[in-house]
Amino acid sequence: MRRSAVFLFCLACVMLGITVGCKDKKPESSQSDSLAVDVPVDTVDTVVVDTVPEDAMDSLISATPMPQSADELFDDFLFNFSANKKLQYERVTFPLKVVDGDSESFIQYKDWRQEHFFMKQEMYTLIFDDESQLALLSDTTLDSVVVEKINLRAKSVEQHIFNRLDGKWKLTQIVRNTMFQNPNKSFLAFYEKFATDSVFQVESMAEPVSVTLPDPDDDFSMIEGDFYPEQWPEFKPGELPSEELYNIIYGQEYRQSRQKLFVLRGISNGFQTEMTFRQIDGKWKLVKLVN
């Protein structure tokens, strides 16, 4: 993930540089000066942001080759795949097979549209059965990974299936199903309400909840303790994603267990929160929080 963070930081710097460069240009003639006074500032900003930078950014990113090492770790590949349009077209097996329930179709090269996944969000999410499965994030021996796009409102799941072929990750198939066909269906149904209902959140706390937080007096240490349901607002990890979730299946097998580890990961800031939920008397409860 460190290489991914560096890549995204550089990407942000390039975008900033282009935007500032465009805004600092001044009209050369006095006639342009008089016209500029009559043009609303919002209009000028819109032109700068919506036209030049986006095209220029696509060209800059596409001209930057992905390092070979990015094919070793799937996360590194996925960040490059999502941001680099040229690379993405090279790494999709066309015609791309799409399975939608009982029907099959194919997407041709000319009809493909760049898939950014969660790159335009501040964070993405992962679902595991337990903490031991976190080791899969750094596994360089994987040869098949599934990226799930979960629409909570539409109750749908779109799976993007990637396979490593001749040492290179490629998108080989898309499978669409309902959320009710997903092995995490019980947890997803619970989470949809949990993410938006503050009263339900408090009701879904164990008593107490185990918590692990960074030690404010030591950057290299963590402190452990407990909190109770009424203290949840003090420990809640910001705004929870409520409309669309992403989940990456690195090979973990879901055993219809009574426990789920829900992970929130920042795109480029190193932020990570782990929330462990467990079914107690048939109801999902938050039992552990690691920030």
Question: Where on the chain are the PLM-derived regions?
Answer:
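C-terminal motif of bacterial Sec signal peptides marking the signal peptidase cleavage site
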Residues: 17-21
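Coil residues (strongly favoring Ser/Thr
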Residues: 34, 43-46, 50-51, 59, ...
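Bacterial signal peptide processing site
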Residues: 22-26
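Surface-exposed, charged secondary-structure patches
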Residues: 97-154, 215, 219-271
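Short, low-complexity N-terminal intrinsically disordered segments enriched in polar/charged residues
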Residues: 27-30, 34-79, 83, 170-192
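Short beta-strand edge/turn micro-motifs at domain boundaries
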Residues: 152-181, 270-291
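Surface-exposed beta-loop interaction hotspot
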Residues: 166-203, 212-221
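Bacterial N-terminal signal peptides that target proteins for export
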Residues: 1-9
